[in-house]
Regions:
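Cytoplasmic helix-loop-helix junction between adjacent transmembrane helices
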Residues: 105-144
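Extracytoplasmic
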Residues: 9-43, 230-235
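A late C-terminal transmembrane helix in Major Facilitator Superfamily
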Residues: 334-370
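Helix-breaking motifs and short loop linkers at transmembrane-helix boundaries and internal kinks
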Residues: 40, 74, 95-101, 305-306
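Juxtamembrane intracellular "pre-TM" segments in multi-pass secondary transporters
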Residues: 1-3, 189-217
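Extracytoplasmic gate region of multi-pass secondary transporters
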Residues: 28-29, 211-265, 326, 330, ...
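Conserved MFS/SLC helix-loop-helix module at the cytosolic interface between two early adjacent transmembrane helices
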Residues: 61-97
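Helix-loop-helix hairpin linking two adjacent transmembrane segments in secondary transporters
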Residues: 140-186
Length: 423
């Protein structure tokens, strides 16, 4: 008989929403090439870049308000509203018959998924110990990786067996089913830590006057450009560079996001070990980011790999280490600002990611159409180390008033459940 902390059971259920989050989002990456071959309506890589840009603008604009909203109304209401809204967006995408209609629904998806990211961060902050938070973020990456890994086969299955519309309908149905599952779980396993009373918008937005938050935001724009590349363009890389069809590419690209989870898990484990050795959480996250950023430089060689198998391994290696970088970088705001403002502070990073992706999506499409992936991989390979250097210079290793009292709260709470080996 083994004892598993109940807080980890709750986090596992909550983070299962991340699977649906990226399933809804990443179906589009494969569908972009399916639409180009099925000719139901005219669709180009430029249109795909425009969809990514519109999604990202909505994602960025909504992010700061979504973080404040989740901090204000609480975890359960915030998560339920976000998931319900993205299910509606998925249904609308499935019912679309033109690029113009797709733009409307992908914008709504961007708004809703910004709230979902804030909710995941809130759950990690409320349920887990400070030393466990990077591992909690790594579990979130598992959900994102599974969703992104399943998405190519999911899109191909419905598009070639039934209709591409049903890929989005099915994703929406699964999302709606998650809401009662989480509400029931949270009833039986409440968070061990309750933050102070919700702050108003002026108090939350006052964080924008802190230079440390701006350093984290700019670093996120730099480091996560490579994440955006592989999350959105991996199928296109194999189709354009190695001349595969969309179904053939789907046999390879599912591997890339799953290795991202392994990278996030290792990144979380590195900082966990460093914290246990006596380093402050901030210092540990920064050290883990440095290790990952140095290894990501190998991305520059990915376009030189001669066949789809090696190219997939190269993309996977790159994504592995950028996710190790990401999981630690996204945990830094929780370490610095605490659980009570975790939704807003991490949403500031989500805002930065959205601004970055909306800015680069259309230029990326143009460069890919004209020059291929080589110049992009060469440029993006050095961006995570630039992001690390910015944080290293502007964010101190020891933050006054860092929140460590949560560990005492959790340890004094009856927070374990027993799972027998026969269950």
């Amino acid at each position: 008989m083994r004892t598993i902390p109940a807080r980890w059971v709750a986090i596992t259920v909550f983070i299962s929403a991340s699977i649906l989050n990226y399933l809804d989002r990443q179906i589009l990456a494969t569908m972009a090439d399916i639409w180009r071959t099925q000719h139901e309506f005219a669709f180009t890589y430029g249109d795909y870049g425009l969809l990514l840009a519109v999604f990202s603008i909505a994602y960025a604009v909504a992010a700061l308000f979504a973080g404040w909203f989740v901090d204000r109304v609480g975890l359960n209401r915030g998560a339920a509203w976000a998931v319900a809204l993205w299910a509606v967006a998925s249904f609308g995408t499935g019912a679309s018959h033109s690029v113009g209609e797709l733009l409307v629904w992908r914008a709504l998806l961007g708004v809703s998924e910004a709230g979902a990211i804030a909710a995941v961060t809130k759950a990690v902050a409320l349920y887990l110990l400070p030393r466990e938070r990077a591992m909690g973020q790594a579990m979130s990456q598992l959900g994102l990786s599974l969703g992104a890994g399943v998405a190519p086969a999911f899109a191909v299955f419905f598009s070639y067996r039934f209709s591409w519309h049903w890929a989005f309908y099915a994703a929406g149905i699964l999302s709606l089913a998650w809401i009662p599952l989480w509400l029931a779980t949270s009833r039986f396993i409440p968070p061990a830590s309750q933050p102070p009373a919700a702050e108003g918008a002026p108090q939350s937005f006052s964080l924008l006057a802190d230079p440390k938050l701006w350093a984290l935001m700019i670093a996120n724009m730099l480091g996560m450009a490579l994440y955006s590349l592989w999350a959105n363009w991996a199928p296109t890389f194999l189709i354009r560079v190695h001349h595969l069809t969309p179904p053939e590419a789907s046999h390879y690209t599912w591997i890339v996001p799953l290795t991202g989870y392994l990278g996030a898990l290792l990144g979380g484990a590195i900082s966990w070990r460093l914290v246990r050795s006596g380093q402050t959480p901030v210092a540990a996250r920064k050290r883990a980011c440095l290790i990952a950023a140095l290894l990501v430089i190998a991305t520059a060689a990915v376009p030189l790999l001669p066949n789809p198998t090696l190219a997939t391994l190269g993309m996977s290696f790159s994504f592995f280490w950028v996710c190790a970088w990401s999981v630690n970088h996204y945990t830094l705001p929780i370490d610095i600002y605490g659980a009570s403002r975790s939704g807003f502070s991490v949403s500031a990073l989500v805002f930065a990611y959205g601004v970055m992706q909306s800015s680069i999506s259309r230029p990326l499409a143009a460069v890919i159409e004209r020059y291929g992936f080589a110049p992009i991989c060469f440029l993006f390979a050095g961006l995570p180390i630039a992001g690390y250097l910015l944080v290293h210079l502007l964010v101190p290793n020891r933050i006054e008033g860092q929140e460590f009292s949560q560990s005492q709260l959790v340890e004094s709470t009856p927070s374990t459940c027993r799972l027998s080996s026969t269950s």
